[in-house]
From Swiss-Prot:
It comes from Homo sapiens (Human). This is Fructosamine-3-kinase. It is an enzyme of class 2 (transferase). The modification N-acetylmethionine is found at residue 1. Belongs to the fructosamine kinase family. InterPro entries: Fructo-/Ketosamine-3-kinase, Kinase-like_dom_sf. Pfam families: Fructosamin_kin. The gene is FN3K. It catalyses: N(6)-(D-fructosyl)-L-lysyl-[protein] + ATP = N(6)-(3-O-phospho-D-fructosyl)-L-lysyl-[protein] + ADP + H(+); N(6)-D-ribulosyl-L-lysyl-[protein] + ATP = N(6)-(3-O-phospho-D-ribulosyl)-L-lysyl-[protein] + ADP + H(+); N(6)-(D-psicosyl)-L-lysyl-[protein] + ATP = N(6)-(3-O-phospho-D-psicosyl)-L-lysyl-[protein] + ADP + H(+). The keyword RNA-binding does not apply.
Length: 309
């Protein structure tokens, strides 16, 4: 593979440093090159290119806001024999600690970004003269994303929808439960879902949801910091409800309390927050069931039962 990387990156220098890393889904390694250090993720699955292209699109969308720091994506390379490699900027990272509060502020600003574009658009509509066009960021008025993204290795359909409950029920929960039905034919999951899906709209009564650009998989393994500030990576972005972002962050720990305090200082909890958080955590339990097996069956079904009480 190193010969392929040299050719694709047009570098004479290609020297691995640090140890090889293995995440839940892909393997990774850092290299020195003529143009500086890079980090290369490798995945041998047949859908690896699609997975990495979704990550590139996510990183580019997050980067374009200027509000959060992410590794700069560079290139996706097809590998002989199947799979792909994804080359990105190398950042010397350590676990999130002193920068947690700053990250909370930045994530809130990210989630408010599209709403502020909407406010700007309304102001311009009330102003005589032509509205700015071209490279200016545009308000996104629907839920979804312009391409498929993968949360783990599972592709997520991001077809645009006008309302959030429909998008979330169809393209997140139903999609995960379809996979569970295919692989496990779990009768109890099927029965609980048939009762739960009709109740989902009730959790959003009276709530205005402006599409927010999300990281999409914000657990502690996808956040870090360096001497400059906080960093987020491995996104599966889409435009959705800002509360969705917090579900996995609260599920598995690793985020200091200061992160949530700083976040909610800018975006206070709306009525019904805790019940919706359960709904969003259900997605993550189902996704883990599909990735890692039956040990996540019990929390998945338990969460559905709690939502039905």
């Amino acid at each position: 593979m190193e010969q392929l990387l040299r050719a694709e990156l047009r570098t004479a220098t290609l020297r691995a440093f640090g140890g090889p890393g293995a995440g839940c889904i892909s393997e990774g390694r850092a290299y020195d090159t003529d143009a500086g250090p890079v980090f290369v993720k490798v995945n041998r699955r047949t859908q690896a290119r699609q997975m990495f292209e979704g990550e590139v699109a996510s990183l580019e969308a997050l980067r374009s806001t200027g509000l959060v720091r992410v590794p700069r994506p560079m290139k996706v390379i097809d590998l002989p024999g199947g799979g792909a490699a994804f080359v990105m900027e190398h950042l010397k990272m350590k676990s999130l600690s002193s920068q947690a509060s700053k990250l909370g502020e930045q994530m809130a600003d990210l989630h408010l970004y599209n709403q502020k574009l909407r406010e700007k658009l309304k102001e311009e509509e009330n102003t005589v003269g032509r509205r700015g066009e071209g490279a200016e960021p545009q308000y996104v008025d629907k839920f979804g994303f312009h391409t498929v993204t993968c949360c783990g290795f599972i592709p997520q359909v991001n077809e645009w929808q006008d309302d959030w409950p429909t998008f979330f029920a169809r393209h997140r929960l139903q999609a995960q439960l379809d996979l569970i039905e295919k692989d496990y034919a779990d009768r109890e999951a099927r029965e609980l879902w048939s009762r739960l899906q009709v109740k989902i709209p009730d959790l959003f009564c009276g709530l205005e949801i402006v599409p927010a650009l999300l990281h999409g998989d914000l657990w502690s393994g996808n956040v870090a910091e360096d001497d400059v500030g906080p960093i987020i990576y491995d996104p599966a972005s889409f435009y959705g409800h800002s509360e969705f972002e917090l579900a996995i962050a609260l599920m598995f720990g690793g985020f200091p309390r200061s992160f949530f305090t700083a976040y909610h200082r800018k975006i206070p909890k709306a009525p019904g927050f805790d019940q919706r958080l359960l709904l969003y955590q259900l997605f993550n339990y189902l996704n883990h069931w599909n990735h890692f097996g039956r040990e996540y069956r019990s929390p998945s079904l338990g969460t559905m039962r709690r939502l039905l009480k």
